């Protein structure tokens, strides 16, 4: 099955956000390095940039929104899961043209690609609680 340009943008954004989180480099450095070094064919590049920059810009607000729904301390959440949650929370809160069910489904699908065996269930549970808290259900 062909992956949509937006799905590819989300997958690339998760990878770039993870790199930003681990490396502590600026979002500009991470973005430049990522688009230079990775195959960006089939990626909605403007949406990738919007997701990456928006998530980093609003990361504190996003973490505050997510915190009540986590079942453990933030630093105990798997870094990949945390990255997917941040990206999905950004989309839920700031990309209002994307239906909330699409955001949740995309978070689940990206978790199936990058997360551990049960990551998609964890992501689904949190996003399902977060969406109504953000007025998206």
Swiss-Prot record:
<dbReference type="GO" id="GO:0031564">
    <property type="term" value="P:transcription antitermination"/>
</dbReference>
<keyword id="KW-0694">RNA-binding</keyword>
<dbReference type="Pfam" id="PF01029">
    <property type="entry name" value="NusB"/>
</dbReference>
<protein>
    <recommendedName>
        <fullName>Transcription antitermination protein NusB</fullName>
    </recommendedName>
</protein>
<dbReference type="InterPro" id="IPR011605">
    <property type="entry name" value="NusB_fam"/>
</dbReference>
<keyword id="KW-0805">Transcription regulation</keyword>
<dbReference type="GO" id="GO:0003723">
    <property type="term" value="F:RNA binding"/>
</dbReference>
<dbReference type="GO" id="GO:0006353">
    <property type="term" value="P:DNA-templated transcription termination"/>
</dbReference>
<keyword id="KW-0804">Transcription</keyword>
<comment type="similarity">
    <text>Belongs to the NusB family.</text>
</comment>
<keyword id="KW-0889">Transcription antitermination</keyword>
<dbReference type="GO" id="GO:0005829">
    <property type="term" value="C:cytosol"/>
</dbReference>
<dbReference type="InterPro" id="IPR035926">
    <property type="entry name" value="NusB-like_sf"/>
</dbReference>
<dbReference type="InterPro" id="IPR006027">
    <property type="entry name" value="NusB_RsmB_TIM44"/>
</dbReference>
<comment type="function">
    <text>Involved in transcription antitermination. Required for transcription of ribosomal RNA (rRNA) genes. Binds specifically to the boxA antiterminator sequence of the ribosomal RNA (rrn) operons.</text>
</comment>
